[in-house]
Amino acid sequence: MAKTSMVAKQQKKQKYAVREYTRCERCGRPHSVYRKFKLCRICFRELAYKGQIPGVRKASW
């Protein structure tokens, strides 16, 4: 889990748009966040395996 202070800092409106960054809405992780789902890869994988993300299924080819 991310520090509460860092999550609060990220949620503030930044003075410059280039300073804004994505964070996982579930756990607060700042790296490897899928913008479309607003989830990090770890949370995305957990929820996808449980079937809680509509339209997502395991690929097989």
UniProtKB/Swiss-Prot annotation:
Pfam families: Ribosomal_S14. Keywords: Metal-binding, Ribonucleoprotein, Ribosomal protein, RNA-binding, rRNA-binding, Zinc. Zn(2+) binds at C24, C27, C40, C43. Binds 1 zinc ion per subunit. Its cofactor is Zn(2+). It comes from the Bacteria. The keyword Disulfide bond does not apply. HAMAP family: Ribosomal_uS14_2_B (MF_01364_B). PANTHER family: 30S RIBOSOMAL PROTEIN S14, SMALL RIBOSOMAL SUBUNIT PROTEIN US14B. This is Small ribosomal subunit protein uS14B. It comes from Staphylococcus aureus (strain NCTC 8325 / PS 47).
